[in-house]
Amino acid sequence: MTNEYKVHIGTEIQGRIGRCRASVRAAVGDNLRNIAATAGASHARARAPLKQGPSMRFYVYEGYRIFYQIDARTRRVVVLDFGVVPAG
């Protein structure tokens, strides 16, 4: 059995990411690959039940916010939302 997690990005979210600069796209991809690699390496997380709670997030260049969830059942890092950080 493999411990590898895959990254899942919906078509609509892929389109939003695709409209960004190359450096933003690269940073998003790097972060998601790192999260997937870390999730696959964590044996404790694989045995823990999927908890329903607030989704996790990270920021790229202080201007973009990415919400994601780690689904241990399907072994995926699922991107839930991507967008510009609201001003304020």
Language model features with spans:
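A short, surface-exposed loop/turn module that caps and links secondary-structure elements
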Residues: 33-60
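Enriched for short, Lys/Arg-rich terminal
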Residues: 1-7, 15, 19, 23-30, ...
